[in-house]
């Protein structure tokens, strides 16, 4: 299982420096939603890290999927 991080460049860069390989920069709410959907479907991702402020910009339908996700486990900071 791998860790994936999605967010603005400033958010993901620290995780890149820590060695997380699956980092995705998403600067717009549309790109964020698209990337989250793609990563949730990746069976190799066990933990998905998001910024709490980004979660609030997502469509409600995707927020519900995130709130109910067991795998990957989604952590907001």
Indicate where each model-derived feature is located:
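Core subunits and conserved enzymes of cellular information-processing
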Residues: 23-30, 34-77
């Amino acid at each position: 299982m791998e860790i994936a991080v999605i967010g603005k460049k400033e958010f993901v860069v620290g995780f890149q420096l820590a060695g997380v390989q699956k980092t995705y920069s998403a600067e717009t709410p549309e790109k964020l939603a698209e990337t989250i959907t793609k990563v949730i479907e990746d069976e190799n991702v066990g933990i998905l890290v998001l910024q709490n402020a980004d979660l609030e910009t997502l469509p409600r339908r995707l927020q519900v999927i995130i709130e109910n996700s067991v795998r990957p486990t989604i952590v907001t900071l």
